[in-house]
Amino acid sequence: MFHATTILAYKGKNKSVIGGDGQVSFGNTVLKGNAVKIRKLNNGKVLAGFAGSTADAFNLFDMFENLLQSSKGDLLKAAIDFSKEWRKDKYLRKLEAMMLVLDRNHIFLLSGTGDVVEPEDGQIAAIGSGGNYALSAARALAKHASLDEEELVKSSLQIAGEICIYTNTNIKTYVIEDEK
């Protein structure tokens, strides 16, 4: 479990949204409260978030973005190629990290063990220490509330931040909307 962050991704009817809290913890100390752990990739057509160490995040984001470019924006192909590279590289294989990536068609959880997991519902995924809280809140809100996709992500992360001591409520989101 990564005691550093909560990232939530939601693929709704009209928008895909990723959000993350801003807390960076080191042991039992909060080092920073306004970190940004999510990114827009592929000219804003792909969103990504990271749970794990910050130094590892930059390396993995760059590696994923390069594979995304070489696959001409094909998220599925990039995710599979990324997972293969991550798994077979001696250094990267030791990283304890996870990523969420999504576009308007897919949402994937990627891990250093080679996993490429699409959520069963194809809509909601979460990682990090508050991930289960955010995931539970998002599922309940998606089923019982009529919130905009971005508000659903923000509300779910707010709930996680109120429960998980490694998650704060300084929430950042990025959105991909359907092209009109």
Curated annotation (Swiss-Prot):
It is an enzyme of class 3 (hydrolase). It is found in: Cytoplasm. Keywords: Allosteric enzyme, Cytoplasm, Hydrolase, Metal-binding, Protease, Sodium, Stress response, Threonine protease. InterPro entries: ATP-dep_Prtase_HsIV_su (IPR022281), Ntn_hydrolases_N (IPR029055), Proteasome_sua/b (IPR001353), Proteasome_suB-type (IPR023333). PROSITE patterns: PROTEASOME_BETA_2 (PS51476). Allosterically activated by HslU binding. One of its GO terms (biological process) is proteolysis involved in protein catabolic process. Na(+) binds at G161, C164, T167. GO terms for cellular component: HslUV protease complex; proteasome core complex. Gene3D superfamilies: Glutamine Phosphoribosylpyrophosphate, subunit 1, domain 1 (3.60.20.10). It catalyses: ATP-dependent cleavage of peptide bonds with broad specificity. The active site is at T5. GO terms for molecular function: metal ion binding; threonine-type endopeptidase activity. It comes from the Bacteria. The keyword rRNA-binding does not apply. It holds the Pfam family Proteasome. Its EC number is 3.4.25.2. The keyword Hydrolase applies. Belongs to the peptidase T1B family. HslV subfamily. A double ring-shaped homohexamer of HslV is capped on each side by a ring-shaped HslU homohexamer. The assembly of the HslU/HslV complex is dependent on binding of ATP. Protease subunit of a proteasome-like degradation complex believed to be a general protein degrading machinery. This is ATP-dependent protease subunit HslV. It comes from Campylobacter jejuni subsp. jejuni serotype O:6 (strain 81116 / NCTC 11828).
